[in-house]
Amino acid sequence: MFIIELIKGIILGVVEGLTEFAPVSSTGHMILVDDMWLKSSEFLGSQSAFTFKIVIQLGSVFAAAWVFRERFLEILHIGKHKHVEGENDQQRRSKPRRLNLLHVLVGMVPAGILGLLFDDFIEEHLFSVPTVMIGLFVGAIYMIIADKYSVKVKNPQTVDQINYFQAFVIGISQAVAMWPGFSRSGSTISTGVLMKLNHKAASDFTFIMAVPIMLAASGLSLLKHYQDIQIADIPFYILGFLAAFTVGLIAIKTFLHLINKIKLIPFAIYRIVLVIFIAILYFGFGIGKGI
């Protein structure tokens, strides 16, 4: 049984790595895969299972931090500046990089404030199957609207052309995504596209903005719940973290490579299908009624 439970931990890490930064809602998938199927709370205990989810989320966040490590160093004026997307050598020499630490901080402020104010309320009252389904569906519609609008925008902006107002509005949408199932990346990428960024630029800024705030939030949660970690459960934490980190690296790089080509509608359609599937399990078979 121990081996089977380890495999379950790895599966949850893989799911987290695949979905945390994709616009499909990692919360929705964790409810489907864990709460409705694998039920980590049954072999880890409810408190330890909650802490396990924090740890595997950190695996995904560290993956994003690694992918954007050079950009973070540049923002902090530590690394070498790389070329700006879409600009030639002369333009690069004459025009400084525009994305800076203030952009990131401006984008983080709304979610940071609302997170401090409402995190406990959201965790207590909004983490249920019906509310997650609502978030998945409404978020999908928002993504479709953003994609439909994007075809009308000529010469969409790159991430280095973002201004502070755009950063702030995208940050507000990150706060809206605190509703479980809405998806942080789905919300912020869609808003970025509506603010006339291209899909890759909106994704880049989404991930850059998300890493510090998610590190802070997950780190704080881990400090609150570290006493729930049992020595016997450490192998689950390690394997889950490594699975989330490894799969997260692959998923993030693949997503960034493809997003300007495939855009958001395929993810929106997938979310709607996922809502239907979860609804059948929940309303038709009563699976997850206790969540």
From Swiss-Prot:
Function: Catalyzes the dephosphorylation of undecaprenyl diphosphate (UPP). Confers resistance to bacitracin.
GO molecular function, one term: undecaprenyl-diphosphatase activity
Compartments, record wording: Cell membrane
One GO cellular component, as annotated: plasma membrane
Signal peptide range: none
EC numbers, comma separated: 3.6.1.27
InterPro entries listed in its UniProt record: UppP
Membrane topology (UniProt): Multi-pass membrane protein
Designated name of the protein: Undecaprenyl-diphosphatase
Enzyme class, UniProt record, top EC level: hydrolase
HAMAP family: Undec_diphosphatase
Stated family: Belongs to the UppP family.
One Gene Ontology term from the biological process aspect of the record: peptidoglycan biosynthetic process
Keywords for the protein's UniProt record, in alphabetical order: Antibiotic resistance, Cell membrane, Cell shape, Cell wall biogenesis/degradation, Hydrolase, Membrane, Peptidoglycan synthesis, Transmembrane, Transmembrane helix
Primary site of residence: membrane
Transmembrane feature ranges: 1-21, 48-68, 102-122, 126-146, 162-182, 203-223, 231-251, 267-287
Misc. remarks from the entry: Bacitracin is thought to be involved in the inhibition of peptidoglycan synthesis by sequestering undecaprenyl diphosphate, thereby reducing the pool of lipid carrier available.
